[in-house]
């Protein structure tokens, strides 16, 4: 009895998508399409694991680099305001309080340090100044922070980026 190997099943379509309020009536099944769903409990588990990992990253003092335009072009984001930078280091610090939107289960003790970059300037139609501007605007519109608070938040992110650049690139060149 022969069995087809999964890596030869090219007629199978695997699609992963998320819709917040999908109803079973909206799902359609096609013999060639694989479908799955997650319960609210499973989504909570995933968010809890993500919060645990973000806390580990924060405690290890690692810095996450965000490339928003690149993530829009080649990632699964449709809009800048969906970028996880707003969860990693929320512009509204109250969101990190236990039960807040960035700390639903009270696992996290603080923000993750982040910097913003442009990724590959030859491929991505943006500048560092534009990345900061767009993310700042999203903070004001979607995270409901004042222009002053959004400016301070972006300035902290910008300083982190400069600090990382200097430590990675300038220290070794000054010793030559």
PLM segments and residue spans:
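Short, structured coil/loop segments at alpha-helix boundaries
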Residues: 48-50, 67, 83, 121, ...
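Histidine/acidic-residue-rich catalytic or RNA/ligand-binding cores of hydrolases
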Residues: 74-85, 124-137
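Hydrophobic alpha-helical scaffolding
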Residues: 39, 43, 78, 118-125, ...
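Mid-to-C-terminal alpha-helical segments outside catalytic/metal-binding sites
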Residues: 51-60, 129-130, 134-176
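Histidine/acidic residue-rich metal-binding segments in metalloenzymes
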Residues: 1-63, 80-113, 139
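Short acidic/histidine-rich active-site segments
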Residues: 66-69, 110-128
């Amino acid at each position: 009895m022969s069995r087809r190997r999964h890596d030869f099943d090219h007629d199978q379509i695997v699609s992963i998508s998320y819709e917040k309020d999908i109803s079973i009536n909206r799902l359609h099944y096609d013999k060639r399409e694989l479908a799955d769903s997650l319960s609210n409990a499973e989504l909570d588990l995933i968010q809890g694991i993500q919060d645990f990992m973000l806390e580990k990253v924060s405690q290890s003092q690692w810095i996450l680099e965000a490339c928003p335009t690149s993530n829009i072009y080649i990632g699964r984001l449709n809009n800048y305001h969906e970028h996880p930078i707003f969860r990693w280091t929320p512009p509204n610090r109250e969101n990190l309080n236990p039960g807040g939107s960035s700390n639903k289960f009270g696992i996290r003790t603080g923000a993750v340090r982040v910097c913003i970059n442009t990724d590959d300037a030859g491929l991505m139609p943006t500048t560092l100044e534009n990345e900061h501007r767009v993310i700042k605007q999203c903070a004001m519109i979607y995270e409901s922070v004042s222009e002053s608070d959004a400016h301070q938040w972006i300035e902290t992110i910008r300083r982190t980026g400069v600090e990382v650049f200097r430590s990675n690139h300038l220290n070794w060149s000054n010793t030559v």
